[in-house]
Each structure stands twice: as structure tokens, then as C-alpha cells.
């Protein structure tokens, strides 16, 4: 199939810039011969006793760092505890060997890769990478969320030459400096002073996230509240968790007209023995398995061999296209996706090409909100 087959017209006004007032107050579209539009908190009515909801428990890290001079990097893939691949903007301003200081901690540019990508090495002073990012980083909101940046002292850089350093009377104790190959010095402050009126640190994170590693949220889970999870448990709906650390590559466009020529990025996955056993048991009993998000679906189907889900840690680059043989997942809860994206292609494979185009046409007519902070839809596997 051609990439253009998966195109549709999406009004920019439908791209959600902020989360709903409450997590479960977003809209939910139930796919079917007659679509049902309701509120997310009513999802309980569409699940049965004995069904299994599988969640991705990966936690978003504060992967966005300001390097001064209007340069930012977004960590993308962990190579080791101290080495990462990152997307830089603009990468042309960075050179191999550039050093960036945050208080007593240092980041070194070690390699320039494909367009926009770099390798960085962290040299941290008695602090873990996660604690470093918690102090100096920001939640990496997707590029399509375009709104005024929160007030952040790390954006207020003081630039000067080392040989002609300006004397500042009152510099906060947590100011830091950046040294680059062209001998510029930039002083930065950590993000302790962020004024975040939209509370992205909370709302761009699922309430059940546990394992740090994602640089983008598994957004289908953002709608769940403790109250909903408690009601599902009372009804007899079971839950299980897998881990897939979402990479920034999830936002990369498909650039080949022949979709089968597209190469997916790899992402780390993990399925515990307990989760594998409950998935297999549910399947054997003939009950429904509902994947909360495309990341969960991709993890489960990647780990399946002859209808049996295997436990373990692995990387997946699975690209699900029409004709894919789904062995495990019966239903998919997901947000609304980009036209011509790997995720829209995935849901067409799962729930039907014509059906998904019709569903999205209906969603657009109903002015449902799209993408990370948008509304959700519950899809049934086409058989």
C-alpha cells in the first residue's frame, strides 16, 4: 500500500494543546457499526468481567535540556548509564568536543550522527542520570504542542567570553556554565524556578508509571484515574503491565511512499513472567485482552510466538501494517493519530482500513481532540 492511502485532512484547531480539565473527562469514541461518543469515565461500561487490560508502565523522564544560545537537546536512546543518543536543535551549532557544565556536572558532545542526531556523554558528580534530569531537564512535550513556554530560568542565559568575564553581583548558587570549542561561556540556572501553570510534569505522565525511560508518554493511559482503576477491579476486570520505553522516533514521519520500505526505530521492551502468564491464561479462557496504547500492543505482539507470549527483555522495531497477523490483542484503546503516521497505519491494520478512515471522519466532524493531550477511542480487532 502507498503512504498516501493513509492521508486525511485534519484541521489544526483539533490538535489538543492542553489536557482536559480532569484526566477522565476527555471524550471516548467507541468504534462500531454505529459509533458511540461518550466520556472516558464510562469506559467501565464497555469492558466485561474477566477481561484483561494491559498497560505500559514506562515513566517519562525529563529528557529535554537547554544548552544555552537557543540550543536544546532531547535525549532519545540510552546506550549506557552515561551515554545517550539525542536530537539537537539546531545541531549545526554543536561540534564534537563541546562541553556543557551544569553546576559541577558536565555533558560532552562525542559524535554527530544523522541529521539532527548527536551522541552525548554525561560526566556527573555523585548523582544519577535520573536525578540530574529531574533537576535540570524538562518534560519533552511533542513538537505539535505549540504554546508559550513556561517561565524557566534555564532559558535566561548569560553569554560572555572567558577572557573578558562580566562581573555579576548576585548570581544564584545553582548557576552553571557551558564551554564550547569556540570559547563561548554561557551561565545557566537549573529548572528549580519553573512556573508550570499547565502542570505538564503531572499530566504528561500516567498515574501508574513506574520505570523511568520514556522520552514521550504512552498517551492512551493518560486518561486513567485511581477511581476508574478501582471500579474496574470491583467489576472483575483484570490488569497487567508491560514496559516499552517510548523513543522520540515515535514522532518521525514516514518518508517512503511504499510503506514497506519504512524502517522503524528500535525501542526497549520488557514483559515479566507474571504478566506473560496472565495474558496467556486470559487468552486460553477465551476472554478479551485490551491493549492500552499502541506501545502496549506492539510489545505484546512482538513477544508472541505461535500464540504464546514469552517473558523477557528485548528490543522491538515492529512495524504493523495491513495484513499483519494479530495473535493476542482483541481490543485497542488509543488516542487519535497523525495522518500518514506509523500509528495510523497500525490502527488501520488492527481495525480495518475503510473503518478507520470512516471513524476519523466522524471524529473530525464531532470536533474530537487529537494527539497526546486529546481524546481516546476504543477499537475492536477486525476478524
Swiss-Prot record:
Record-listed E.C. numbers: 2.4.99.17
The entry's keywords: Cytoplasm, Queuosine biosynthesis, S-adenosyl-L-methionine, Transferase
Swiss-Prot/TrEMBL catalytic activity: 7-aminomethyl-7-carbaguanosine(34) in tRNA + S-adenosyl-L-methionine = epoxyqueuosine(34) in tRNA + adenine + L-methionine + 2 H(+)
Pathway this chain belongs to: tRNA modification; tRNA-queuosine biosynthesis
Localisation: Cytoplasm
Xref: Gene3D superfamilies: QueA-like
GO terms for biological process, alphabetical: queuosine biosynthetic process; tRNA wobble guanine modification
SUPFAM superfamilies hit by this protein: QueA-like
Pfam families: Queuosine_synth
Family stated for the protein in its record: Belongs to the QueA family.
Function: Transfers and isomerizes the ribose moiety from AdoMet to the 7-aminomethyl group of 7-deazaguanine (preQ1-tRNA) to give epoxyqueuosine (oQ-tRNA).
Name the UniProt record assigns to this protein: S-adenosylmethionine:tRNA ribosyltransferase-isomerase
Organism per entry: Rickettsia prowazekii (strain Madrid E)
Gene that this sequence comes from: queA
Amino acid at each position: 500500500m502507498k503512504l498516501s492511502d493513509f492521508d486525511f485532512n485534519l484541521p489544526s484547531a483539533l490538535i489538543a494543546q492542553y489536557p482536559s480539565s480532569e484526566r477522565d473527562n476527555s471524550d471516548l469514541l467507541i468504534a462500531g457499526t454505529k459509533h458511540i461518543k461518550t466520556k472516558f469515565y464510562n469506559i467501565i461500561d464497555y469492558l466485561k468481567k474477566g477481561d484483561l487490560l494491559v498497560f505500559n508502565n514506562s515513566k517519562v523522564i525529563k529528557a529535554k535540556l537547554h544548552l544555552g544560545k537557543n540550543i536544546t537537546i532531547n535525549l532519545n536512546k540510552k546506550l549506557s548509564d552515561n551515554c545517550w543518543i539525542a536530537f539537537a536543535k539546531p545541531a549545526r551549532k554543536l561540534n564534537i568536543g563541546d562541553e556543557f557544565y551544569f553546576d559541577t556536572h558536565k555533558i560532552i558532545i562525542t559524535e554527530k550522527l544523522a541529521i539532527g542526531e548527536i551522541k552525548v556523554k554525561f560526566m556527573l558528580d555523585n548523582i544519577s542520570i535520573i536525578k540530574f534530569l529531574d533537576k535540570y531537564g524538562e518534560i519533552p512535550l511533542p513538537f505539535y504542542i505549540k504554546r508559550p513556554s513556561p517561565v524557566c530560568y534555564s532559558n535566561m542565559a548569560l553569554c560572555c567570553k572567558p577572557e573578558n568575564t562580566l562581573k555579576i553581583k548576585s548570581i544564584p548558587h545553582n548557576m552553571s556554565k557551558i564551554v564550547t570549542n569556540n570559547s563561548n561561556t554561557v551561565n545557566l540556572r537549573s529548572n528549580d524556578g519553573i512556573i508550570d501553570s499547565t502542570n505538564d510534569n503531572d499530566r504528561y505522565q500516567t498515574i501508574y508509571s513506574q520505570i523511568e525511560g520514556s522520552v514521550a508518554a504512552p498517551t492512551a493511559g493518560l486518561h486513567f484515574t485511581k477511581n476508574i482503576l478501582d471500579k474496574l477491579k470491583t467489576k472483575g476486570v483484570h490488569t497487567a503491565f508491560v514496559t516499552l520505553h517510548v523513543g522520540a522516533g515515535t514522532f518521525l514521519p514516514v518518508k517512503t511512499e511504499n510503506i514497506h520500505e519504512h524502517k522503524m526505530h528500535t525501542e526497549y521492551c520488557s514483559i515479566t513472567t507474571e504478566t506473560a502468564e496472565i495474558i496467556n491464561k486470559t487468552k486460553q479462557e477465551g476472554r478479551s485482552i485490551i491493549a492500552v496504547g499502541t506501545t502496549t500492543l506492539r510489545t505484546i505482539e512482538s513477544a508472541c510466538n505461535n500464540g504464546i507470549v514469552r517473558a523477557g527483555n528485548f528490543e522491538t522495531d515492529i512495524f504493523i501494517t495491513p495484513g499483519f497477523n494479530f495473535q493476542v490483542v482483541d481490543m485497542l484503546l488509543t488516542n487519535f493519530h497523525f495522518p500518514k503516521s506509523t500509528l495510523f497505519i497500525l490502527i488501520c491494520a488492527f481495525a480495518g482500513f475503510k473503518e478507520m478512515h470512516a471513524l476519523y471522519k466522524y471524529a473530525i466532524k464531532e470536533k474530537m481532540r487529537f494527539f497526546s493531550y486529546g481524546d481516546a477511542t476504543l477499537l475492536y480487532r477486525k476478524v
